[in-house]
Amino acid sequence: MKILITEDEAIVAGELEAIVTDLGHQVVGIAGSSRRAFKLAETTKCDLAFVDVQLSDGMTGPAVARHLSEDARATVIFTTSNPHHVPADFSSACGILIKPYSEHSVKSAIAFVVDCMETGRSLRRKPRALELSPAYAERWKMS
């Protein structure tokens, strides 16, 4: 799985990168701003993206998520300590992983979302730390 990390805190981005690569996935880039994320979306292909709501250039994560989801066809997971800043429609993202998160919660979220992406439905229990958008809960038959 090719994964893009959009996170402006270098330590957090590095930890997330280590977790992703430890699971055997490829990190195609790390962006700290919406501008960098849009550039990476043009030059790389990602299947999954972790997108912080608040980036170095402001509250731009929702715009990045919508672009990645709708234009680049990536599945997006928001990472944020402020879930109330996520729009009601989740900006087309599949869900939210609330900070601070543990290594276990990231690994569980990735495994769950990858299963859903590959099969079109959930094969395992949704991780407690992952809040799914209503659209993805319906799509992945999480009634």
Model feature map: region roles:
Residues 7, 80:
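Conserved acidic carboxylate
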Residues 17, 30-48:
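Acidic, metal-coordinating helix/loop segments flanking the phosphotransfer/catalytic sites
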